[in-house]
Regions:
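Alpha/beta-hydrolase fold catalytic core
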Residues: 1-63, 88-89, 129
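Catalytic domains that recognize anionic headgroups
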Residues: 37-40, 45-47, 51, 74, ...
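Active-site loop/oxyanion-hole signature of alpha/beta-hydrolase fold enzymes
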Residues: 45-49, 55-57, 96-138, 142
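Conserved HGGG/HGGXW glycine-rich cap/lid loop of the alpha/beta-hydrolase fold
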Residues: 50, 56-101
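Conserved catalytic-core motifs of eukaryotic protein kinase domains, centered on the activation segment
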Residues: 77-79, 102-108, 168-170
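Short, hydrophobic alpha-helix immediately C-terminal to the catalytic nucleophile
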Residues: 79, 120, 144-148
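Conserved hydrolase catalytic core segment
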Residues: 84, 88, 125-175
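Flexible "cap/lid" subdomain of the alpha/beta-hydrolase fold that forms the substrate-access gate
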Residues: 153, 158-244
């Protein structure tokens, strides 16, 4: 009995120490916003109370191109594209709900329909009736869903490693299972976030190493991944309210 009590006490002590070591508080919104806004950053409030961060850059007289980022990313993903395309095109980017400087929204709706409403609200706010719509990964899924819902508004689609229909996704997963283990593994963060128990405690943990692994995996371990890039993902994830 004494051994059991000692074991339990030791386990509790280890868990407490681990919790203290792994705990990371949130960063104030004002601090993160000041660092990651630019002179072209704008905010507007949707009817549901969501405060949306977006940018309207490039040639204002050129064709409008709306670009939608992927999961766990932000509009900063498109900054290199703005530099390349901005001379000839008007480039609109935005942070979707639960992402970037938009963060949490009052109605707690973050699914596909909420994403479509956000895109539509941004272009409506800017008075844009027709545009080219593009996105990568999750943003690609937003792109083709929005095009199906509003074909009269979209002049062309740009799909970059887009998420697809469920049956296509299942086929891709089957193909992935045939690849080498180190190539097929999903980023640790995405795997863990599928588990309810982890989601419940994730908001209290320091996400740095998970973020670093996830970014490297998402970028296929490209030399483009710098500490500055990792820090951006990390600090945006720690923005107050983003982990709720």
């Amino acid at each position: 009995m004494k051994i059991i009590k000692i074991t339990i006490a030791s386990s509790i002590m280890i868990l407490l120490c681990a919790g203290i070591f792994l705990y990371k508080g949130e960063l104030p919104q004002e601090e993160v916003d000041a660092k990651y806004t630019s002179e072209t950053s704008q905010f507007f409030t949707m009817k549901n109370g969501a405060r949306i961060h977006f940018r309207d850059e490039g040639n204002q007289a050129g064709p409008a191109v709306v670009l939608v980022h992927g999961s766990n990313a932000s509009l900063h993903t498109w900054e290199p594209w703005v530099k390349i395309l901005g001379e000839n095109y008007r480039i609109i980017t935005m942070d979707l709900p639960a992402h970037g400087l938009t963060g949490a929204v009052p109605d707690n709706k973050y699914g596909a329909q909420a994403q479509l409403r956000t895109v539509d609200a941004v272009v409506g706010h800017l008075g844009i009736d027709k545009f080219i719509l593009g996105g990568n990964s999750m943003g690609g899924g937003v792109t083709w869903r929005y095009t199906l819902a509003h074909p009269e508004k979209v002049e062309a689609m740009l799909l970059i490693d887009s998420s697809g229909l469920p049956q296509f996704t299942q086929e891709l997963e089957t193909m992935a299972n045939q690849l080498d283990q180190d190539q097929k593994e999903a980023p640790v963060f995405f795997s863990l976030m599928r588990k309810p128990w982890f989601r419940a405690i994730a908001k209290y943990l320091d996400p740095y190493w998970i973020t670093k692994q996830g970014v490297n995996s998402a970028y296929n371990y490209s030399p483009m991944v710098t500490e500055e890039l990792i820090q951006r993902y990390y600090e945006l994830a720690l923005r107050d309210g983003s982990r709720d």
